[in-house]
């Protein structure tokens, strides 16, 4: 079929010439079909577009993303740490053994046993308030576990201070290394500098370290996690049961989880004992006879003690180190930043003064234990000043902060 072409010469067309034939929708439709086919062939020759992937591939990359199937559109797709992102980057977890799923299953099974064997009789014969209070504590436990396990612990953005000289171990001229301090530590892949010095004492120093893996100067009390391969702000520890780091952003949820988990265990023990005693009185039996008729409360007592011991021990330990203004990482590694002893009391460094809200470099912790604990567990996590961007740079440098993973 021949198609209309514009005239090559000027002047009005003559009557009966092809130029004088009017162009209708029917005559232009084949041209439109040919143009679309031509565009599809051209796109196919250039390669598949990122939006032309199958629905199953796009759904899989949105639900469980390990490696991006196309060029990264969000910062979490260009993230270089050892993390797995879920539901379009809204949740994250370490790329280790998923023990957090096993812990969640144990919690749900223990709650299911309580609701199946102890709660119905307690609701009908003692008081409905007892299972209702347990439900509230149990929901707090599950919610705190999910928030601590799948949320951002305070991961610091990468590739901010791209200095090859620092990564090689050489120090720029604008910095000076304190005498007696090894500048470059190849075992930890860090470079240490004495950055701040308090005027009250020349011995109380706060050190900055350059992480050669993340290419950033870590702020005070931040540390690099070898399991997650990330620098975490106020890094406390890496919890294998959560399969995530515990840092500034999820520390309170971790403490809330272990506290409510221990309370659930003790609540199950107390309710099961009350169940046995009330059933004995109601049926006019001895304790041995009531246990033969209903042996499940005895099993729940054992499981409750087993599930409450370890969480309550963790609660006591973290309340103790929180009262000292320390983290688990600082307590285990004996960090000199937090281990200056003055008159038998641990001195407060510059970073601890920020936690306590005090500028006294040697304020005793015994005078403000409650203030330190409240500041550590209840302090507001300030929002980041940098805007949360949607797309990454062509080099994959992460400019935004970790406020929302779905836009990180």
Swiss-Prot record:
Active site residues of this protein: 239 (s-palmitoyl cysteine intermediate)
Post-translational modification: Autopalmitoylated.
Subunit-structure text: Interacts with ERF4.
Enzyme superclass (EC): transferase
Membrane topology: Multi-pass membrane protein
Localization, UniProt: Endoplasmic reticulum membrane
Species this chain originates from: Yarrowia lipolytica (strain CLIB 122 / E 150) (Yeast)
Protein family per UniProt: Belongs to the DHHC palmitoyltransferase family. ERF2/ZDHHC9 subfamily.
Residue ranges, annotated region (Disordered): 1-55
EC number annotated for this UniProt entry: 2.3.1.225
GO cellular component terms given for this protein: endoplasmic reticulum; endoplasmic reticulum membrane; Golgi apparatus
Chain intervals with Low complexity compositional bias: 1-14
UniProt domain comment: The DHHC domain is required for palmitoyltransferase activity.
InterPro entries: Palmitoyltrfase_DHHC, PFA4/ZDH16/20/ERF2-like
Lumenal topological domain residue ranges: 122-125, 275-296
Cited function: The ERF2-ERF4 complex is a palmitoyltransferase specific for Ras proteins.
Protein name per the record: Palmitoyltransferase ERF2
Gene Ontology BP term (one): protein targeting to membrane
Highest taxon of source: Eukaryota
Stretches that traverse the bilayer: 101-121, 126-146, 254-274, 297-317
Record topological domains on the Cytoplasmic side: 1-100, 147-253, 318-408
Keyword vocabulary terms for this entry: Acyltransferase, Endoplasmic reticulum, Lipoprotein, Membrane, Palmitate, Transferase, Transmembrane, Transmembrane helix
GO molecular function: protein-cysteine S-palmitoyltransferase activity
Residue intervals of the DHHC domain: 209-259
